[in-house]
Design a protein with these regions (language model features):
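Conserved P-loop NTPase nucleotide-binding/switch module
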Residues: 65-67, 71-124, 129
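Conserved P-loop NTPase
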Residues: 122-143
Length: 143
């Protein structure tokens, strides 16, 4: 999530212009903020809202910070789902993570299932751990 955030925020030379990003970091796992200062490099156009419920943080960001992209990890509650739908209706893009061993596992959560079935997401990336530090990455376009 940190690398994705930094690349969206800074941009990628000749490929992607940097965008205004707000990270909703409910438990400080992405930014590792200490006394309000990010300890991880999340990019030059990144603001962080931490120590607040994700759904509330998303709405605060949209109303007062003009993000082009919201980033949050471990989504899955009804409040998260409603906030994500609100963000998309406001034209804000998002990068979100959810835990599960497979798409079928993630779809057991009714809120995530609803977001996927409603085609709120353009793309789903599944990262499966394979023996130690090896990973298998599967990408699925939704729309």
């Amino acid at each position: 999530m940190r690398d994705i955030t930094r690349n969206i925020s800074n941009g990628i030379l000749n490929k992607l212009q940097g965008l205004n990003v707000v990270v909703i970091d409910e438990r400080g796992e992405i930014s590792s903020s200490y006394r309000g200062v990010m300890q991880n490099d999340l990019g030059i156009r990144t603001d962080v809202i931490n120590d607040i419920q994700k759904s509330i943080g998303m709405k605060i960001a949209i109303r007062s910070m003009a993000p082009q992209v919201l980033i949050a990890d471990e989504i899955g509650s009804e409040d998260d789902s409603e906030a994500i739908k609100y963000a998309m209706c406001c034209g804000v893009k998002g990068v979100f993570s959810a835990h599960g061993n497979s798409l079928e596992d993630v779809m057991k959560n009714p809120e995530l299932k609803g977001l996927i079935q409603d085609k709120i997401f353009e793309k789903i990336i599944i990262i499966k751990s394979r023996h130690g530090s090896n990973y298998e990455i599967e990408t699925m376009n939704i729309n």
